[in-house]
């Protein structure tokens, strides 16, 4: 899994990764953020919260890294 779309979106919105942890509407833990930074999977509910808060779709923030399949 690749979250490169999310990282790019955060840059475009002038936000840091820690904003995902600090934002009460998203409310992810620092360990979840670490998992995402390593390209590990997280729950759909987390992705949904991120999309709702950043006003985007799943495809904007996550993609399949076919080189790792």
Question: Residue ranges of each PLM-predicted region?
Answer:
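Residue-level detection of the helix-turn-helix DNA-binding "recognition helix"
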Residues: 11, 25, 37-38, 66
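Short, basic-rich loop-to-helix N-cap that marks the start of a DNA-contacting helix
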Residues: 39-52
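Short alpha-helical DNA-recognition segment
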Residues: 14-34
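Short, charged recognition helix plus adjacent turn
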Residues: 8-9, 62-69
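The alpha-helix within a helix-turn-helix
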Residues: 10, 21-23, 51
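A short, Lys/Arg-rich alpha-helix, primarily the initiator
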Residues: 1-18
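Residues that mark the N-terminal boundary/hinge immediately upstream of a DNA-recognition element
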Residues: 16, 43-46, 57
